[in-house]
Amino acid sequence: MPRQLDRYDMSEQQGISIIMVNTEEVPGKTITKTLGVVSGTTVRAKHVGKDIGAFFKNIGGGELKAYTELLGESRDQAVQRMLEEAVGRGANAVVNVRIATSAITPGASEILAYGTAVVVE
């Protein structure tokens, strides 16, 4: 069974769709042009009210759902920004996609999405 590709709709109004994979090639497609590295980043800070709840949850154990949601939203925003840059360069796919995180300050984290913008046929 063939692996399904990740396809993102950039905007319903624009009607733009782009392929995103974490491999060097897009299965079933040929890379005809490499447009270079593209990236998207966001820096998010924790919410004080959520920190209090997380403190108590941390004592008892379990998932910190508020932080899971925050990281998920941050990841999505970084990916969206990366894809917007790729579309701006004329790409219809991004290969070798990676996502990295780093602590900027004790209360804030950076999420970086990056990959190589390409044209595939």
Residue ranges and their predicted role:
Residues M1-K50, G88, I111-E121:
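N-terminal presequence-like segments and the immediate start of the first folded domain
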Residues T23-V26, I99-I104:
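Short, solvent-exposed loop/turn elements at beta->coil junctions and helix N-caps
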Residues V38, V43-R44, K50-R98:
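Short, well-ordered alpha-helical segments
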Residues A93, G107-S109:
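Positively charged, aromatic-enriched nucleic acid-contacting surfaces
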Residues I104-T105, G115:
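C-terminal structural segments of small proteins and small subunits
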